[in-house]
Amino acid sequence: MFHLLKKEIINMAKMSSINKNNRRIKLSNRFFNRRKALKKIIMNKNLSLEERFKAQQKLSKLPRNSAKIRIRNRCQITGRPHGVYRKLKISRIALRQLGLQGKIPGMIKSSW
């Protein structure tokens, strides 16, 4: 459905930025369980301070880009990083274009 729109929208984000974000998503998914386990150890007050400190050091040695906070929400169509609706994963501009083309059911241009 959206592959037709890519040709019509001129302003695409740089492919390097999109690829960098995709790499971060893959890294985050790969290290998710390991990071979660280490954070659980760090937050556990019943463990000794030494064990918690070792877990903190292991966590800091993991790649920075494996942290979920480093991922940027981007538009799936244009790659635009700002003005992205989380549920739709589409930027406000792409959403407007799709709506005007009649590709989103029930969405019409308002008039009053």
List the predicted regions and their residue ranges.
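Intrinsically disordered, Lys/Arg-rich N-terminal extensions and targeting peptides
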Residues: 2-85, 97, 104-112
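Short cysteine/histidine-rich metal-coordination sites, predominantly Zn2+-binding motifs
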Residues: 90-99
